[in-house]
């Protein structure tokens, strides 16, 4: 069983699935709950009210308002980063420092190509799996379009 920590408790972390129009799971917490191999063991947000609310709703017993404390105190295998883009680089570096094995980061890693490249290299160097959540990449429709394009039936395609 992999222990998961979620940093940032906005819509994509949890509440986006409360929309009855959504037919599939989009949130990090609910996606991890569906897996037999993962357990969300701790959550973190700067809003303590949000931490308490989601802790109660999801039966998560470990909640923090400082992600550094969570990384220091919890033995996490996977961390989902659901915070604003300008925070991603430092959080990823701190996750690496605390031996997190896999990081699932909301798009994009950074506003800076240099910072993004540095993060990719740090993850490679430290054997950390890094995935960036570009949801549409795995969407069935987009996979079909990709297959059509890669079969080269249409010649050069320009955007």
Region annotations inferred by a language model:
Residues 1-58:
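N-terminal Rossmann-like dinucleotide-binding module
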Residues 28, 88, 134:
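Histidine-centered active-site/metal-ligand motif
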Residues 31-34, 53, 69, 94, ...:
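Well-formed, non-transmembrane alpha-helical positions, independent of function
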Residues 38, 101, 128-129:
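Short, well-ordered coil/turn segments that N-cap beta-strands
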Residues 58-122:
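Beta-loop-alpha module in the N-terminal Rossmann-like domain of NAD(P)-dependent dehydrogenases
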Residues 109-159:
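A contiguous active-site-proximal alpha/beta segment in oxidoreductase catalytic domains
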């Amino acid at each position: 069983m992999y222990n998961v920590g979620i940093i940032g408790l906005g819509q994509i972390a949890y509440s986006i699935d409360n929309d009855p129009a959504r037919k599939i799971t989009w949130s990090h917490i609910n996606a991890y709950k569906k897996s037999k191999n993962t357990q969300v063991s701790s959550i973190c947000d700067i809003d303590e009210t949000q931490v308490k609310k989601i802790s109660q709703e999801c039966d998560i017993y470990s909640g923090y308002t400082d992600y550094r404390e969570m990384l220091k105190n919890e033995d996490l295998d996977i961390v989902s980063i659901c915070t604003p883009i300008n925070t991603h680089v430092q959080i990823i570096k701190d996750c690496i420092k605390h031996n997190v094995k896999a990081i699932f980061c909301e798009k994009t890693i950074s506003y800076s190509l240099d910072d993004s490249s540095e993060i990719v290299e740090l993850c490679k160097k430290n054997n950390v799996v890094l995935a960036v959540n570009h949801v549409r990449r795995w969407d069935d429709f987009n996979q079909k379009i990709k297959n059509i394009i890669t079969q080269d039936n249409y010649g050069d395609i320009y955007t």
